[in-house]
Structures are given as C-alpha cells and as structure tokens.
Amino acid sequence: MAKTLGLHIIADLYGVNPDLIDREEDIRHLLENSVKAGELTKISSHFYQFNPHGATGVILLAESHISIHTWPEHKTATVDVFTCGDPSKAYRAMDYIINSLSPTHVDKKVFDRGIIEDSKGKDVLWIMSKAGCC
C-alpha cells in the first residue's frame, strides 16, 4: 500500500463578488485567516496588487503553501492549498476561503502528492516529522 507526502487542493471560484477579490489587503486578510482556520504554520508571505484590477498572494507554510490569484473583472479567483501531514488542515483552509468568498460555482480538484511505497514512506515521513513539516 502506498502513502502520500501531501494533499494538494486546487479550486477555481466563479461568480465571486468583485469587491471581495480586488484589493491586495483583502486577499492578505483572507489567506491569513485561512491559515488560522486550518491551524497551519505561516513562515512568510508575499502579496501584489495589479492595476487596474486584481491581486495575487502566497503564504509559505511549514506544511507547504496557500496561494490565490484573482480576476475581479471576471468574478473569478483561483486557489491552491498544498499541505503535508494532516489532510483535514488543507480542507479546513480551503473551506474557509470558499465560504468567505461565496462563489456561485466551484471547480475543485484534490490530488495526492508524493506517492511513496509503504516501506520507504515510514522512513521519509519520520524524517519529515522530525524536521517539523508533518
């Protein structure tokens, strides 16, 4: 049986209120609160305001990352949540973002990342846990 090193959730959010995704400050607040909702560990972050519309941002996590890119003129945001360790943390972070933005339609995909063999997986996961990742 194989194990995985992480869970990657990607989502395209359509029909989002443009006022919620136009400003860098709002995107920053949204992602930082999603980190808290997922009980994840923030290492650093970077955000950027586009002109005339939209913003992008990423939070580097001890567990991996959360990112968003927005197109308010199309009422659309794309979101990535990738974590190692407890998969429920990734789901909680993504659910927070989706619930906060209240899109009319969500196209969400979930991927297992870093599939490893059981015999090797125990060693790799143990090393990663000692490094504080998972």
UniProtKB/Swiss-Prot annotation:
EC number: 4.1.1.50
Needed co-factor(s): pyruvate
Pathway note: Amine and polyamine biosynthesis; S-adenosylmethioninamine biosynthesis; S-adenosylmethioninamine from S-adenosyl-L-methionine: step 1/1
The entry's keywords: Autocatalytic cleavage, Decarboxylase, Lyase, Polyamine biosynthesis, Pyruvate, S-adenosyl-L-methionine, Schiff base, Spermidine biosynthesis, Zymogen
Active-site residues, Swiss-Prot/TrEMBL: 64, 69, 84
PTM entry text: Is synthesized initially as an inactive proenzyme. Formation of the active enzyme involves a self-maturation process in which the active site pyruvoyl group is generated from an internal serine residue via an autocatalytic post-translational modification. Two non-identical subunits are generated from the proenzyme in this reaction, and the pyruvate is formed at the N-terminus of the alpha chain, which is derived from the carboxyl end of the proenzyme.
Gene Ontology CC terms, in alphabetical order: cytosol
Reaction(s) catalysed by this chain's protein: S-adenosyl-L-methionine + H(+) = S-adenosyl 3-(methylsulfanyl)propylamine + CO2
Presence of keyword Manganese: no
Positions marked as site (Cleavage (non-hydrolytic)): 63-64
GO molecular function list: adenosylmethionine decarboxylase activity
Textual note on the cofactor: Binds 1 pyruvoyl group covalently per subunit.
Class in the EC hierarchy, top level: lyase
Residue list for modification Pyruvic acid (Ser): 64
GO biological process: spermidine biosynthetic process
S-adenosyl-L-methionine listed as a keyword: yes
Xref: InterPro entries: AdoMetDC_fam_prok, S-AdoMet_deCO2ase_core, S-AdoMet_deCOase_pro-enz
Pfam families per UniProt: AdoMet_dc
Subunit structure: Heterotetramer of two alpha and two beta chains arranged as a dimer of alpha/beta heterodimers.
Annotated PANTHER family: S-ADENOSYLMETHIONINE DECARBOXYLASE PROENZYME
Known function: Catalyzes the decarboxylation of S-adenosylmethionine to S-adenosylmethioninamine (dcAdoMet), the propylamine donor required for the synthesis of the polyamines spermine and spermidine from the diamine putrescine.
Homology family: Belongs to the prokaryotic AdoMetDC family. Type 1 subfamily.
Name of the protein described by the UniProt record: S-adenosylmethionine decarboxylase proenzyme
